[in-house]
Amino acid sequence: MRNSFTLALVIVIATCISAHGQQRNSINSASARADSLQQLVNEAARAALTKFADKKLTESQLSITLIDLRDAQHPATASFRGNERVYPASVVKLFYLVAVHRWLEDKKIQETQELKRAVRDMIVDSSNEATQYVLDVLTQTTGGFELPAKEMEEWQYKRNAVNRYYSALGFTNINVNQKTFCEDAYGRERVSRGPNGENRNKLTTEATARLLSEIVTGRAVNQAHSTQMMELLKRNFIGTSKDNDDQGHGFTGIALAGMDSAKLWSKAGWTSTTRHDAAYVELPNGAKFVLVTFTTDHANEREIIPTVARVVIDAMK
């Protein structure tokens, strides 16, 4: 009896030691993977900063976040200035896209042909007018003449609906409550933005990469809505395009030239002072990653983003 008890105790202790060892090895492996990914992001940043040093590209004008999704259950993330708040241009439309599908899934809004058309144009064509309509639907607010202070306060609370949604999910350091315009905002839209733009949209590459990774792994919304979003984000980077700002050919897709069996999903954004891309890439060898690159004050430098992407792709191939 005593021998049986002793044997059982030895087995239990051995099992605990083995499990502890496996856990420690797993932690060490994850730590090594994270360190390796951080080195890769640092290398990509250095490559861009060195290549464009003569164009006066500085660290303060570049932000990068990379999420390795080769093991989707245990993604690894690394950033270079990933928590810096940057005006996102049309990349903010990615956040409105997810919000629309969440609202639809929760039956807060109804899908109409007009909403479906607007969402498609917002993502595929990056239409600002479509985005304005989408944000109206999401927040039940509209632009127009200035409002009295009390009414404007109520209007602004409603307009912050998308902000509240992402805040509840743990997103921090972002602001997603403004429409995108080809020229400028007027009336209550301008009042909302603030006289000095203090309430402009702001995103970080970390928040953007997190959202895109949740889209591609099906965690943002249900599978049906995830599939619809991925269809809109799919980009063709093969061949050439007459449009330098084509989302497939003018950003991360440049780095995929010659890799016809690779796949790209993305949302780019650009203005006279910014050039950004949020991309999800699948390589022929099975590597999968999200790469978000924001650049400021170098909007006409089409090669900064692909320079970053090439370093990542070469390491992942």
Predicted regions mapped to residue ranges:
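Active-site SXXK
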Residues: 87-109, 122, 291
